[in-house]
Swiss-Prot record:
<dbReference type="InterPro" id="IPR011356">
    <property type="entry name" value="Leucine_aapep/pepB"/>
</dbReference>
<feature type="binding site">
    <location>
        <position position="344"/>
    </location>
    <ligand>
        <name>Mn(2+) 2</name>
    </ligand>
</feature>
<keyword id="KW-0378">Hydrolase</keyword>
<comment type="similarity">
    <text>Belongs to the peptidase M17 family.</text>
</comment>
<feature type="active site">
    <location>
        <position position="272"/>
    </location>
</feature>
<feature type="binding site">
    <location>
        <position position="265"/>
    </location>
    <ligand>
        <name>Mn(2+) 2</name>
    </ligand>
</feature>
<keyword id="KW-0963">Cytoplasm</keyword>
<feature type="active site">
    <location>
        <position position="346"/>
    </location>
</feature>
<feature type="binding site">
    <location>
        <position position="344"/>
    </location>
    <ligand>
        <name>Mn(2+) 1</name>
    </ligand>
</feature>
<dbReference type="GO" id="GO:0070006">
    <property type="term" value="F:metalloaminopeptidase activity"/>
</dbReference>
<dbReference type="Pfam" id="PF02789">
    <property type="entry name" value="Peptidase_M17_N"/>
</dbReference>
<feature type="binding site">
    <location>
        <position position="342"/>
    </location>
    <ligand>
        <name>Mn(2+) 1</name>
    </ligand>
</feature>
<keyword id="KW-0479">Metal-binding</keyword>
<protein>
    <recommendedName>
        <fullName>Probable cytosol aminopeptidase</fullName>
        <ecNumber>3.4.11.1</ecNumber>
        <ecNumber>3.4.11.10</ecNumber>
    </recommendedName>
</protein>
<dbReference type="GO" id="GO:0006508">
    <property type="term" value="P:proteolysis"/>
</dbReference>
<dbReference type="InterPro" id="IPR043472">
    <property type="entry name" value="Macro_dom-like"/>
</dbReference>
<dbReference type="Pfam" id="PF00883">
    <property type="entry name" value="Peptidase_M17"/>
</dbReference>
Amino acid sequence: MFQVQKELASHEAVVVALFEEEKTSSFVQELDKAFEGQLQVLLEEKELSTKKKAISKVHSLGKTDVKRYYFVGLGKKESYTTETLRSALGKTFKTLQAAKVQDAAILLDSFVTEKLDAIDVAHIAAEVQGLGTYELQTYKSDKKDRVKLEKFTAITAEDAQEIEAALTVGYVHGRATNSARTLVNMPPNVLTATKLAEYAVELAEKYDMDYKVLEKEEMEELGMGALLAVNQGSVEPPKMIALIYKGKEEWTDVIGFVGKGITYDTGGYSLKPREGMVGMKGDMGGAAAVLGAMEIIGELRPEQNVIAVIPSTDNVVSGTAFKPDDVITSMSGKTIEVLNTDAEGRLALADGITYAKKLGANYLIDVATLTGGVIVALGNHTTGAMTNNEELFEQVLEASMETDESIWQLPIFDRDKERVRNSKFADLNNSPGREGHAVMAGTFIGEFAEDTPWVHLDIAGTSESSGAHDLGPAGATGAMVRTLATLVERFGEE
């Protein structure tokens, strides 16, 4: 699909950058020779806009071998960022898709500044091409296939091999994020814990990873009472899924991802209202993020050891379901008083984290659609983070900044630990109350990380979008897929 060339050839569409202070850039001047000065007139008349994310279409009318030019406004260079570029190109690729363009090119060097080099631009362009044109996988009987971009050429004076490599990495990042989106959007009667495990196994086999899928009997032998408690009410068997990627000869320095895999959450006996239950098919967004990251890792093969653990079940009501006031024993041996069956994700993660440590994880990053509290605190565009290790958090933060996936650190104080340890009947309670809800959930999970360096990522607000946006349609976003993969890539380079 991707090509790199030094000269512009015949294309249906060519994408060109426009900065506010460079209306007469060398790229525009060169094109304007064929247009006999008409582009400059359009700029002066403001029919070609330099405003951020403005897209101006100009037909060549046979003056060049290119049918149409799409000029992308990027605003002032001083405020130009990777986020600006991602949004602008996302909107551009949506526009190209709507116009049924199959062969497009980008004047890559027109997007290059002192802040962003050609490799950065190539990576982002290939990544965003996939993200911006992602389509929901529906179950409608009258599906209509859209015309898709078949050929995309980067026009640049830079080294072709380096640009091709950047295009490949960007494409893989975008494709894997879309894989995660598709998982999150799937209905719960289709994506059960069993089906999620089958997907994970297929992924592992494709990329020659080791894997384990623990069945209920094996979980009982290992004492995974927290995950098993959540599963008690279900007719669907639980799964503890583990993917093992060996990027080094020695099994050391292992990053452990733990993704919440609750395939549907009714709240259990602490039942959600209808409004709160619809959409809970997406409560396995953490699992999807982890699997998306493992797809990238499998494709790009970084020199880093990684484990991905996914505790998976649904949380439903029945005569056998667990109840408020139950006391359960986790795999770690710690006992938990259940005060809220709708705080089930942290129970599943407790056993998931303990299992990841058993498999050799030296660093832990858990990802979960965990609390409504994080949405109240940070909204729908920022993932909440908590940690017991500032050095590891800084590495996660740097990866998130590189991918433009915003995260914000929430605190853990001793008084928070006291609240989750406040139980007359057990070592911990799973829901100390509404106050500081997001912090309480993260603090509870930290009790199982113990001294292992750990970062918690609550994607309840960022896992899905209520409306269409520059990087995709309404629905799942694939939050944290690219951040997790970038973290591993950076670890592997050290």
